[in-house]
């Protein structure tokens, strides 16, 4: 388990929260970010789960993350609301400006110079993170 230096107030977050991590390099003046250049044994894995009870970050292996279709971190065809008797579908969404506390860019990324830093901003940095939350979806079908 890793320490959480990123999310300070997680009391109002949903139960299912994932943190996506990437490292970047600058090539010919353009920043390029990818999870493939995360440094082993230095950086966290590409995905971490937030334990909303104590705020710790739990590493997720690549085998846990099964599908990246439509930019969702987990396969949605089998995802259901946990502990619910109904079979309500849920979707993963990027958390955008949670309670106006975070300085993020238009795609939900926060940037910093390293992952252990407590200061994250909407631009400039060697590493970046974004938060995914799983929320129930409503059906608006015409029956």
Swiss-Prot record:
Keyword list, A-Z: Cytoplasm, Membrane, Sporulation
Subcellular location: Cytoplasm; Prospore membrane
Keyword Cell membrane among UniProt keywords: no
GO CC term, one of those recorded: prospore membrane
InterPro entries the UniProt entry points to: Peroxin/Ferlin
SMART domains on file: DysFC
Topology with respect to the bilayer: Peripheral membrane protein
Any Gene Ontology biological process: ascospore-type prospore membrane formation
Predominant location category: cytoplasm
Biological function: Required for spore wall assembly and ascus formation. Involved in the formation and elongation of prospore membranes.
Family: Belongs to the SPO73 family.
Quaternary structure, from the entry: Interacts with SPO71.
The protein's name: Sporulation-specific protein 73
Protein's organism: Saccharomyces cerevisiae (strain ATCC 204508 / S288c) (Baker's yeast)
């Amino acid at each position: 388990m890793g320490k959480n230096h990123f999310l300070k107030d997680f009391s109002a977050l949903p139960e299912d929260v994932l943190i996506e991590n990437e490292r970047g390099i600058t090539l010919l003046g353009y920043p390029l970010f990818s999870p493939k250049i995360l440094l082993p044994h230095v950086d966290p894995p590409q995905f971490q789960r937030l334990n909303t009870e104590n705020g710790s970050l739990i590493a997720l292996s690549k085998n846990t993350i099964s599908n990246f279709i439509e930019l969702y971190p987990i396969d949605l065809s089998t995802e259901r609301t946990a502990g619910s008797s109904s079979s309500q579908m849920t979707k993963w969404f990027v958390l955008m400006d949670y309670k106006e506390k975070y300085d993020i860019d238009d795609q939900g990324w926060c940037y910093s110079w390293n992952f252990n830093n407590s200061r994250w901003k909407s631009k400039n940095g060697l590493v970046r993170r974004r938060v995914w939350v799983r929320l129930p979806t409503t059906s608006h079908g015409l029956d």
